[in-house]
UniProtKB/Swiss-Prot annotation:
Alphabetical UniProt keywords: ATP-binding, Nucleotide-binding, Nucleus, Phosphoprotein, Repeat
InterPro entries assigned: AAA+_ATPase, AAA_ATPase_domain, AAA_lid_3, ATPase_AAA_core, ATPase_AAA_CS, P-loop_NTPase
PROSITE patterns assigned to the protein according to its UniProt record, in alphabetical order: AAA
Species annotation: Schizosaccharomyces pombe (strain 972 / ATCC 24843)
Family the entry assigns: Belongs to the AAA ATPase family.
Protein name: Uncharacterized AAA domain-containing protein C16E9.10c
Nucleus in keyword set: yes
Record GO terms (molecular function): ATP binding; ATP hydrolysis activity; preribosome binding
């Protein structure tokens, strides 16, 4: 029994010791109270940390707590004494004085006298004026040092905060190109209330409290807010929304309140919250209760920014996001984020302005055609154009290194590769050492270790060809987001299909190029076009040509890629496509294999597929505005598409892309063989009217030309490849290769029509069913 009682006492002492050590560490870090604490304070602390200690009798608990406090005090004494011993020993080593060594004992005596005061019940009862003075002076000095430390810390924090609230000075609105409409709207909504609040007070108009900037990544939301702050010259609070989130309960809401309180104290003030969707998601879909509390705190703080609560000094909030639909709906109502400004993917004219603005700080050489460069950068946002400029600069530097230090001026004898050449070998005047760019740059750095002089820097400049080469190295962010760059297919790449070209020009291309003409006759809603017909007849090629001709943003969607096995994800993907298109209008959406997305709704169709059909129907002709968004769909099974897709207002124009006739086959062959060298004996007119081409589609004719070219290449170059004689093969490759009639005859044996007579009759019956559409197309 005695052993068990001893072990219990040790366990109790160990528990209390752990709790009091944590209390001591906390006090030393925060300095909110003095150490050592009283026995009563220690008992209160350990009972709060461990509920089981409340069941122990008070005398026993007091005895153990006092014992642990004495132990901790002794540890502090030893550390203090050892630190002072070290200080005195170091000073003695420097002075080499024996008299100073005796001061260690006196210091220890003083330490003991001071630490003995800790166990006394009341400092006032201690005798000795010297001890009182020493203790009082030490406590006063310690508290003064702590106050001084706190004041210095707080002062440095305040100075840092004040420095961060200055508006950025490295960018202005004149440095931004292609966003003229957005800048004018921001000046109206933000600059006017901040600069002239008296106008709103006099007229009794409530100015907007918040403006939401949304658009694809890299379009300039953050840069626009920084430039506006510099233009206004008012205190600017810029915060990243994820930095508000804290792991401690209540800390996130506290940070939100502190930021808004600081903004009101600095009023007139402009606040910018980047990636605001990270902290204000929809409350019904929030994963944690903390997210709901943060949203509620944001709503409350936004309501407190009225003129009445800010003493007539305006505080405006600008939020930025690329996912506006994920924000809580209460945050987007009037009185909070009153206005929303959409920064779209820049058009060709906007890209030209952006490039001209970026070129102001560059050293360019030659005649730059910014208009042509803007045409070659469809889908590029401001960040992509900046990356393009940087890539062009790197290419220019590599080129200039080669020009400044040509290979014949470098010390070629130092290259070890020359030592490996045989003595009887010599380089001709036209020969050069095959060095790569890395070796050129390395040799240049070795030859010029010092900074270049102004005379050497003079030839450094970026030429137009550097930008052309950089286009292949920079991928637009919109392409990673689901956009496709404008295809390099024009009407010249398409043979025949002239009647369908005219219909597509009237339905898609001209409304984008000349919208005022259509508005003058009352046509405002965009048209949807359904291209249907046998496979391989050029439906996808037509859509690419339309996108290229209109110079609009282009989104290519293959029907099955939007389908998802999770509930609601397919519908969300459909909505996201139209959301991106509306943000980048004018935009052409091309749905390939539409029958996979919108099959006919009946009892056999699953509920998930029905929801996808309903979502697409409402996006095409629902409550949401579809201005500037044009839809082209392609299918070879129009009979299984839901009939509601084909009513007016959706895909109301159906165009049959049928198999080409004899005359159209000749035109297609002429287009396909522009890059193929043909023998004089080849007659494309006879070839296109051959009976064996009766059911050939455009894709079949392309396969025929490709197979004939491969046959000619095999007979001219690779005839001896099986015998493993590369020298003969290399010699044969130097001879001109031309495709002959014999090559086409061999190709006819391998290429068969992809559409049978039975399939063609089926499409003819479908064309009769839609007689009105097919008759117009046939004309």
């Amino acid at each position: 029994m005695r052993r068990s009682g001893t072990s219990l006492s040790r366990d109790l002492e160990r528990k209390i010791h752990e709790r009091l050590v944590s209390l001591k560490d906390t006090i030393q870090q925060t300095e909110i109270e003095e150490w050592p604490v009283s026995t009563r304070r220690a008992i209160q602390f350990v009972q709060e940390r461990d509920m089981s200690l409340r069941r122990i009798k008070k005398p026993i608990l007091e005895k153990v707590v006092e014992k642990v406090l004495d132990t901790l005090k002794a540890e502090v004494e030893e550390k203090l004494a050892s630190s002072q011993d070290l200080v005195l020993v170091d000073s003695d080593m420097e002075e080499q004085s024996d008299s100073n060594l005796m001061e260690v004992k006196d210091t220890n005596v003083i330490n003991k006298s001071i630490t003995s005061l800790w166990s006394s019940p009341n400092l006032k009862e201690i005798d000795g004026e010297d001890e009182k003075k020493s203790v009082g002076q030490e406590s006063i000095t310690g508290s003064a040092k702590r106050k001084d430390r706190r004041s210095k810390t707080n002062g440095s924090k305040r100075q840092k905060a004040e420095a961060n609230r200055e508006p950025p000075s490295d960018i202005s609105l004149s440095d931004i190109g292609g966003l003229d409409d957005c800048i004018n709207e921001l000046l109206e909504l933000v600059a006017m209330p901040i600069k002239h609040p008296e106008v709103y007070q006099y007229t009794g108009i409530h100015p907007p409290r918040g403006v939401l900037l949304h658009g694809p990544p890299g379009c300039g939301k953050t840069m626009l807010a920084n430039a506006l702050a510099n233009e206004l010259g008012v205190p600017f609070i810029s915060i990243s929304a994820p930095s508000i989130v804290s792991g401690m309960s209540g800390e996130s809401e506290k940070k939100v309140r502190e930021v808004f309180e600081e903004a009101k104290s600095l009023a007139p003030c402009l606040m910018f919250i980047d990636e605001i969707d990270a902290v204000t998601p929809k409350r019904e879909s929030a994963q944690r209760e903390m997210e709901r509390r943060i949203v509620a705190q944001f709503l409350t703080c936004m309501d407190e920014l009225s003129f009445e609560k800010t003493d007539g000094k305006p505080v405006l909030v600008i939020g930025a996001t690329n996912r506006p639909d994920s924000l809580d709906s209460a945050l987007r109502r009037a009185g909070r984020f009153d206005r929303e400004i959409c920064l779209t993917v820049p058009s060709q004219d906007a890209r030209e302005k952006i490039l001209r603005t970026m070129a102001k700080g560059l050293k360019l050489s030659g005649d730059f055609d910014f208009r042509q460069l803007a045409k070659q950068t469809p889908g590029y946002v401001g960040a992509d154009l900046k990356a393009l400029t940087a890539a062009a600069g790197i290419i220019a530097i590599k080129r200039i290194f080669n020009e400044i230090s040509p290979l014949n001026k470098l010390d070629l004898n130092s290259d070890p590769r020359f030592n490996e050449l045989d003595s009887d070998m010599a380089l001709d005047s036209n020969d050069s050492l095959p060095l790569d760019h890395s070796s050129i740059i390395q040799r240049y750095l070795n030859a010029h270790p010092d900074p270049l002089s102004p005379e050497e820097l003079e030839p450094l400049a970026i030429c137009p060809q550097d930008f052309i080469e950089a286009l292949a190295k920079v991928q637009p962010s919109s392409k990673r987001e689901g956009f496709a760059t404008v295809p390099g297919v024009s009407w010249n790449n398409i043979g025949a299909l002239k009647s369908i070209r005219v219909e597509l020009q009237m339905a898609i291309v001209q409304p984008i190029k000349r919208p005022e003409l259509y508005q003058s006759v009352g046509i405002s809603a965009p048209t949807g076009v359904l291209l249907w017909g046998p496979p391989g007849c050029g439906k996808t090629l037509l859509a690419k040509a339309v996108a290229n001709e209109s110079k609009a943003n282009f989104i290519s969607i293959r029907g099955p890629e939007l389908l998802n096995k999770y509930v609601g994800e397919s519908e969300r993907a459909v909505r996201q496509v139209f959301l991106r298109a509306r943000a980048s209008s004018p935009c052409v959406i091309f749905f390939d294999e539409l029958d996979a997305m919108v099959p006919r709704r009946d009892d056999s169709l699953s509920e998930a597929s029905s929801r996808v059909v309903n979502t697409l129907l409402t996006e095409l002709d629902g409550l949401s505005d579809r201005s500037g968004v044009y839809v082209i769909a392609a299918t070879n099974r129009p009979d299984i598409i839901d009939p509601a897709m084909l009513r007016p207002g959706r895909l109301d124009k159906t165009l049959l892309v049928d198999l080409p006739d004899a005359h159209e086959r000749v035109e297609i062959l002429k287009t396909l063989t522009k890059q193929t060298p043909l023998h004089e004996e080849v007659n494309l007119d006879v070839l296109g009217r051959d009976e064996r081409c009766s059911n050939f589609s455009g894709a079949d004719l392309a396969a025929l030309v490709r197979e004939a070219a491969v046959t000619a290449l095999r007979s001219a170059v690779f005839a001896d490849i099986a015998s493993n004689e590369p020298e003969i093969t290399q010699h044969s490759a130097l001879e001109p290769i031309r495709v002959t009639n014999a090559d086409f005859e061999l190709a006819f044996k391998n290429i068969k029509p992809s559409v049978s007579d039975r399939d063609r009759q089926k499409y003819q019956r479908l064309a009769k069913r839609w007689s009105s559409a097919s008759t117009n197309d046939a004309d």
